[in-house]
Amino acid sequence: MIQTSRRHFEELVADALDSIPPELTDYMDNVVITLAEDPPEPGLLGLYEGVPLTERGDSYSGVLPDRILIYWKEILAICDTAEDVVEEVRITVIHEIAHHFGIDDDRLHELGWS
């Protein structure tokens, strides 16, 4: 297990977001990404809570932002090196953003992002 501060982990998440092309991030709408401590089930690295873009209708307005939760301690627990942490953060952030865009777990698995 790797040790790092929450602040450093936040920087890794920011770096992962910066690696996503603006052509995609420009379409992210009403979503916040935050670090969380304890996942609802062991081994869960990230969680998207909200209404995917593909399911939003004309009446979608005045709602609280969707949330992407990154369970930082779970990620640290499965990684052996600092490089593993960077890669797992990137994969987890992209995976959860894909859910925001309406891509389900089966399709992510087909694409190699599960």
Across the structure, where does each feature detected by a protein language model lie?
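Short alpha-helical catalytic segment bearing the HExxH-like zincin motif
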Residues: 88-96
